[in-house]
């Protein structure tokens, strides 16, 4: 594709890669209500109830450690403050609409909230850790008299690989998430091509998804700043100043304040995470307001930021002991740099500098402190950019930093996916009092 952009510069991007990047954005930037892991439980439970054909009297919930970690402490939306695994499953059984996928419990009625609570009080929901090689693994079996239905989700929040009823396999597919076309597409991501794509993309190809991200994520950030949610990190930040850096951190944190506390507003996610979707987008949106840039510049900055976040997470994986906000905050710094006219060298240095600062932050599940980690990660993204402007950088050999942005990204992926496996196990043991 050859497209003339502002100033008459012509840039080319392979047609296949262009369409791949568009499709990645369409697949990743989808709306979800509530923290994604509990919603995945609700979705799985709702699907199993549909297969069973009646409300179950018993439930067996078998889940991987990272699902336990990310559901244990978070409030399930539309449940009047119910928290945890059993609440997410009960909400899916009583009020879920599996056809709405990650918005499965978006339309819970008031009388259904009481039904959810009654169900939790009068029915047996057994939760067991699942011995599995998959970081994200959900297996829910629902029983009623002599009938049962089972649904299993693996590797991605909506990836159903097995449906069974009364010993009959209704649906089964070999799980090829690690080798399928979608993940191969993500492996084609690299910083240089992402920047080129952001410069030349026909905005008609991405306008719908980016405009939805702006609208949804801005709305929940405003909600988080207006009302009392979690530890109110967004409001705490704004109480200390109103400069643009503080606002960028505060709006991202405020969205997380609300989301982690069960706010019913949807969020456009990134890499399977609402917190990451807000972290990468809201600082860029705030800077665009400050700089009074046009919509086109904002959209291109968000395209860049979202794809850089996805690029980093592709190597780390959906769930890890590595805090995903770090990747998203780094990507936000890149989007902000783009608003100022950054070139490839600037973007590359922003990434390396940022990752050198905050890559040690752990993920200990979804809960109110995520908002503070988001603020720290956004701050690192902005600092990484400002370091470059001042001629400063972290150099080859400074810890995990090596020469070349792609090499440093690979090191971080290795750290998050392989190096922190034992850390992840210990975090889960601590959180489950084992």
Walk through the language-model features, giving the residues of each:
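Conserved phosphate/anionic-ligand binding catalytic regions in large, soluble enzymes, centered on
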Residues: 31-47, 265-282, 323-327
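Flexible, glycine/charged-enriched surface loops at secondary-structure junctions
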Residues: 55-59, 100-105, 127-128, 204-210, ...
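Early transmembrane hairpin of solute transport permeases
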Residues: 39-138, 142
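A structural signal for small-residue-enriched, beta-sheet-centric alpha/beta enzyme cores
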Residues: 13, 32-36, 63-70, 74-77, ...
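Acidic-glycine-rich active-site phosphate/pyrophosphate-binding loop
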Residues: 12-22, 55-69, 243-262, 294-312, ...
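Short, Lys/Arg-enriched N-terminal segments with co-localized hydrophobic residues
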Residues: 1-10
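Signature of multi-pass transmembrane helix bundles
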Residues: 117-262, 427-434
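Hydrophobic alpha-helical bundle architecture
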Residues: 49-51, 77, 287-300, 310-376, ...
């Amino acid at each position: 594709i050859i497209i003339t952009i502002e100033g008459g510069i012509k840039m080319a991007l392979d047609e296949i890669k262009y369409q791949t990047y568009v499709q990645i954005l369409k697949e990743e930037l989808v709306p979800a209500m509530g923290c994604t892991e509990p919603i995945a439980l609700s979705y799985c439970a709702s699907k199993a109830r549909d297969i069973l054909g009646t409300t179950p009297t018993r439930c067996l919930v078998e889940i991987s450690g990272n699902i336990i970690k990310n559901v244990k402490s978070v409030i399930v939306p539309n449940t009047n403050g119910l928290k945890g695994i059993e609440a997410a499953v009960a909400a899916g059984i009583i009020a879920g609409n599996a056809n709405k996928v990650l918005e499965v419990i978006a339309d819970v009625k008031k009388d259904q909230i009481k039904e959810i609570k009654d169900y939790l009080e009068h029915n047996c929901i057994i939760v067991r850790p699942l011995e599995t090689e998959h970081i994200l693994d959900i297996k829910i079996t629902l029983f009623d008299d002599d009938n049962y239905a089972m649904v299993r989700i693996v590797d991605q929040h909506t990836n159903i690989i097995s449906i069974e009823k009364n010993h009959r396999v209704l649906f089964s597919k070999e799980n090829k998430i690690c080798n399928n076309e979608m993940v191969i597409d993500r492996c084609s991501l690299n910083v240089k091509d992402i920047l080129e794509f952001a410069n030349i993309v026909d905005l008609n190809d991405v306008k719908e998804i980016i405009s939805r991200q702006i609208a949804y994520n801005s709305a929940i950030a405003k909600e988080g700043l207006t009302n009392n949610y979690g530890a109110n990190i967004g409001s705490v930040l704004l109480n200390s100043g109103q400069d643009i850096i503080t606002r960028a951190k505060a709006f991202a944190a405020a969205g997380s304040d609300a989301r982690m506390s069960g706010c019913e507003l949807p969020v456009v996610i990134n890499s399977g995470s609402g917190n990451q979707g807000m972290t990468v987008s809201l600082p860029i949106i705030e800077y665009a307001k400050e700089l009074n840039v046009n919509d086109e510049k904002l959209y291109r900055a968000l395209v860049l930021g979202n794809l850089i976040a996805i690029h980093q997470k592709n190597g780390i994986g959906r769930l890890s002991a590595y805090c995903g906000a770090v990747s998203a905050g780094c990507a936000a710094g890149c989007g902000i740099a783009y608003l100022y006219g950054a070139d490839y060298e600037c973007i590359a240095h922003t990434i390396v500098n940022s990752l050198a600062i905050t890559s040690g932050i752990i993920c200990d599940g979804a809960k109110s402190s995520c908002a503070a980690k988001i603020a720290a990660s956004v701050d690192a993204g902005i600092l990484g950019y400002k370091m470059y402007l001042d001629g400063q950088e972290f150099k080859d050999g400074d810890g995990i930093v090596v020469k070349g942005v792609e090499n440093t990204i690979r090191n971080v992926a290795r750290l998050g996916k392989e190096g922190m496996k034992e850390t992840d196990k210990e975090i889960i043991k601590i959180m489950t009092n084992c």
